[in-house]
Every structure is written in C-alpha cells, then in structure tokens.
C-alpha cells in the first residue's frame, strides 16, 4: 500500500494536522517510520505519550523550517515530506510580518532546497483558501509559498521527486480556530459570541478530510498540482 514501509516526515508535526495525520497513518498503514519535525520539545514529549504502542515507528526531531542545515539532516532517508509548519494566525502575522515571511516563505524555500539535495520522492505542502486573492499577510505568504512549490518542479531534472500543494479552507477544531474559541467562551459563561459580521461565511473541512486529501495527493501527484476538495460553506452564525 501507498505508505507501507515508507518513511514520512511532517514539518510542524506537533500541530493539529500532524496529530491527526500520524494517528490516521498508524491506524491504516504500516509505515517504516514517521518523523515529527518541530520546534517545541514539550509538545513532542506530549505527542510521544499519546502513541506508546507505536514508539518504534515514531521519531521526534527538534528543528525549525528556518534552519536549512538541520532540516536537510532530518530529510536523510525520508521518502515523503508533508510540509505543515506555518505561522497561521492572521493577527500575529500582521504584527510580526518579518517573522511570518521567515517561516512561511523562507521556510518553504528551505523545504524545497532540502528535498532537492536529499532523496525525497514527494513533497506535499499544505496551503489555504486565504492564498486566493489574499487580503492579509498570512494569505500573501502562503500564495508565495505555493508559487515556490509549484516552480520547484522545474528544478527536479531527472530526480524521482515532485512537489504538489493541498489547499483547503478552515479546519474544524484545529488549534487557534473559531470552534475551540467558541467552546471556551461558552464555558466562561458568555451570553454572546463575538461575530464581526453576521453575513460572514466560511468553508470548513474536518481534520480527517484534510488528512485524506493529503494522502490522495501523495498517491496521485505527478508534480505541480494543487489539490482542492469540494467542501461546504455556511454562515458563522449557524456555527455559533
């Protein structure tokens, strides 16, 4: 099967997507190894304790996508890379534009360069609907990141390597998203939930659907594709 006996590395692997992807792959496939590449040792420790049965298949690698040399070392012996690391909170990116560019743009280029200089076979980068006609810095950095990954296919030459993108909307229940925030406000006893505009709509996808779309990309990508699933939209007031 697709991921059996394969080594997969996830950048930003201790995030919501990384948790769900790791669990899904361990339950549905027999990978050789899953490498969690992230900056936070405490989150890695917590995640390791979530999967005690699979400790022989999990490897935790402290590192930052801003650090090319560290990432290149982590990529050695890896078959597939899922690039999920990003600064994604819109206000944080607006107030810290240089940091957003370092992670979301320079980090993407580091992933590309490390993949080109090791034996990686496929790279799937996670994107967002905010990269379409971006109106904020986060969306802008992800648009640039997408362009970099698509263009990287031109540099593969005779290498057995390709780059593709998975793009979806808001991930329901992911850390920092509106659903956990609404739950927090309800637990605090608030009688009203803060909604900027009652006409707002959002496109939503579950974490599992996001993982399945990434696996579809790994299976079907030839290089340069942007995979987009059809997902429903609804008003934020309906969610509230």
Cite the ranges covered by each PLM segment.
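Conserved residues in the N-terminal Rossmann fold of short-chain dehydrogenase/reductase
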Residues: 38, 61-62, 102
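Conserved Rossmann-fold NAD(P)-dependent oxidoreductase catalytic core, especially the SDR/UDP-sugar
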Residues: 80-83, 87-147, 151
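Conserved glycine-rich Rossmann-like NAD(P)H-binding loop of the short-chain dehydrogenase/reductase
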Residues: 26-43
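N-terminal Rossmann NAD(P)H-binding glycine-rich loop of SDR-like oxidoreductase domains
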Residues: 6-28
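Hydrophobic/aromatic anchor residues within beta-strands of the central parallel beta-sheet
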Residues: 60, 100, 163-166
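NAD(P)-dependent short-chain dehydrogenase/reductase
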Residues: 137-138, 143-227, 231-240
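Residues in the short beta-alpha loop(s) of Rossmann-like NAD(P)-binding domains
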Residues: 40, 129, 232
């Amino acid at each position: 099967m697709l991921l059996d006996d394969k080594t997969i590395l996830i950048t930003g692997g201790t995030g919501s997507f990384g948790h769900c992807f790791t669990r899904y792959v361990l339950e549905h496939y027999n990978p050789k190894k899953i490498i969690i590449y992230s900056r936070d040792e405490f989150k890695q420790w917590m995640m390791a304790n979530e999967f005690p049965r699979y400790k022989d298949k999990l490897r935790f690698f402290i590192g930052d996508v801003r650090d090319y040399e560290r990432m290149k070392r982590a990529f050695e012996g890896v078959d597939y890379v899922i690039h999920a690391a990003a600064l994604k909170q819109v206000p944080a990116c607006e107030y810290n534009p240089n940091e957003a560019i370092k992670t979301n743009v320079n980090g993407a280029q580091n992933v590309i360069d490390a993949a080109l200089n090791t034996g990686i076979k496929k790279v799937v980068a996670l994107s967002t609907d905010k990269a379409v006609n971006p109106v904020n810095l986060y969306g802008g950095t992800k648009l640039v990141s997408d362009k970099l990954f698509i263009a990287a296919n031109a540099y593969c030459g005779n290498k057995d390597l390709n780059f593709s993108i998975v793009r979806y909307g808001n991930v329901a229940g992911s850390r920092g998203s509106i659903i956990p925030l609404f739950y927090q406000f309800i637990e605090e006893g608030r009688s009203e939930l803060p909604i900027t505009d009652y006409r707002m709509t959002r496109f939503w996808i579950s974490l599992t659907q996001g993982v399945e779309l990434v696996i579809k990309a790994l299976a079907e990508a030839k290089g340069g594709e942007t995979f987009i699933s059809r997902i429903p939209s609804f008003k934020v007031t309906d969610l509230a």
